[in-house]
């Protein structure tokens, strides 16, 4: 990616970011990432841990960048172009667009499923 516009490398807790990640920009976190805002097409977010987007994910998302195969990507409006978890990449994933979805890694393959709350 071209330009890192934000990073937050302090300790292992979740990092909170707010705003829109615009095309050509990249936001990184050395732990879990919580983003309140949107990720536009052509933008990228990357976290060592899990990624949760309270907004629309239209760009690229990389979770588990530190090798965690248990990491996941969750977005309220999941419309990602490319996703990666640990060392597994999935381009133009097939799923129901425009809803709350969660990407997980299982048997070395990324699955994207509708996120349902079970309480």
Residue ranges and their predicted role:
Residues 1-23, 64, 69-119:
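Intrinsically disordered, low-complexity terminal regions
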Residues 26-28, 44-46, 104:
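Well-ordered beta-strand positions
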Residues 45, 55-56, 71, 78:
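Extracellular beta-helix/beta-solenoid repeat scaffolds
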Residues 34, 41, 52, 59:
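Short, catalytically relevant binding-site loops at active-site mouths
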Residues 18, 23-24, 30, 36:
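A short, contiguous structural element within a folded domain that forms the immediate neighborhood
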Residues 21-24, 39-44, 61-64:
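Short, T/G/N/S-enriched strand-turn elements that build extracellular solenoid repeat scaffolds
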Residues 38, 56-57, 88, 115:
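Surface loops and adjacent helix of pleckstrin homology
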């Amino acid at each position: 990616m071209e330009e890192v516009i934000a990073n937050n490398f302090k300790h292992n807790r979740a990092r909170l970011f707010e705003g829109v990640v615009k095309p050509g920009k990249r936001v990184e976190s050395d732990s879990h990432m919580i983003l309140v805002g949107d990720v536009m097409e052509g933008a990228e977010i990357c976290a060592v841990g899990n990624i949760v987007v309270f907004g629309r994910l239209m760009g690229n998302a990389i979770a588990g960048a530190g090798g965690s195969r248990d990491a996941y990507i969750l977005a309220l409006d999941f419309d990602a172009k490319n996703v990666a978890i640990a060392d597994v990449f999935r381009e133009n994933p097939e799923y129901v667009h425009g809803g709350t979805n969660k990407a997980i890694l299982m048997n070395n393959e990324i699955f994207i499923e509708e996120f349902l709350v079970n309480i």
